[in-house]
């Protein structure tokens, strides 16, 4: 790699630099005996966050599948509007999954490739109830993940999760409206 430095060409030996993952190895800066990362956050905190984010990612995969299937199989004129909304929800859930995978990688983890098992019902109202319960569970999980992220000093992550949770709450509102619960 060649870069400019004070109008001179400078060669940089990239072999001297550690890889992104190598830079994430534990160093002991914490006050207890638990290994910590370079910022002094106990590695178990980040591992817990990564596990939680992977669980959230698996739920997003499930949501994508359910929204795609349900938007295509809802029956009845009264469900036309929500069927269109579910298509939008599916694309938003994909955006959430992409962001979660990015954050998991940033924290040094490997994003899961396995989703939670999708649910199905042939009854339109039951499909929406399934989605509503899933959204409510997801919101609860993201609130916990925000708490964990802030405790670990991962404030950018907590802000990303707040953006995601706002969309999940919009999904909850759409589903409650479609079910006549609001």
Description of each model-found segment:
Residues 2-182:
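Iron-associated oxidoreductase/ferritin-like identity signal
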């Amino acid at each position: 790699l060649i870069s400019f430095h004070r109008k001179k060409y400078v060669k940089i030996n990239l072999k001297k630099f550690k890889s992104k993952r190598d830079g994430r190895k534990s160093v002991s800066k914490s006050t207890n005996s638990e290994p910590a990362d370079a910022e002094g956050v106990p590695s178990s905190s980040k591992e817990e966050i990564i596990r939680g984010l992977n669980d959230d990612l698996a739920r997003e995969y499930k949501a994508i599948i359910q929204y795609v299937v349900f938007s295509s199989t809802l029956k009845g004129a009264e469900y036309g509007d929500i069927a269109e909304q579910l298509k939008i929800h599916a694309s938003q859930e994909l955006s959430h999954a992409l962001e979660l995978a990015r954050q998991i990688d940033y924290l040094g983890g490997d994003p899961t490739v396995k989703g939670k098992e999708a649910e199905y019902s042939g009854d339109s109202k039951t499909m929406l109830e399934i989605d509503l319960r899933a959204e409510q569970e997801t919101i609860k999980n993201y609130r916990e993940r925000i708490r964990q992220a802030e405790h670990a000093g991962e404030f950018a992550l907590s802000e990303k999760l707040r953006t995601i949770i706002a969309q999940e709450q919009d999904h909850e509102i759409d589903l409650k409206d479609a079910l006549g619960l609001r």
